[in-house]
UniProtKB/Swiss-Prot annotation:
A molecular-function term among this protein's GO annotations: ribonuclease P activity
Function: Part of ribonuclease P, a protein complex that generates mature tRNA molecules by cleaving their 5'-ends.
Annotated Gene Ontology cellular component terms: cytoplasm; ribonuclease P complex
Record's protein name: Ribonuclease P protein component 1
Highest taxon listed in the record's lineage: Archaea
Protein's GO biological process: tRNA 5'-leader removal
Catalytic reaction equation(s): Endonucleolytic cleavage of RNA, removing 5'-extranucleotides from tRNA precursor
Amino acid sequence: MITADNITSHEFIGLNTEIVQSTNPQVIGLNGRIENETKSMFTINTENGMKSIAKSTSNWKFSIDSNDVIVEGSRIAKRPFDRIGGKA
């Protein structure tokens, strides 16, 4: 189960997110559902279509159990497999 304490060790695909801070002011406020994740990017399904956004340059807001959790992109800028702790 995803909680505010363990969100950085879970899968993000399928979660809704919003960019609350970024080095690129044009993406602040962008929100939608995460459709894909790579080491450095999220692909988000927004009202205006799919957008690929760099993880490390933004802070991301997720709503978990009616609580908003802000995650620094630099903390999650890893391959999902490595972040989750998978073994080969």
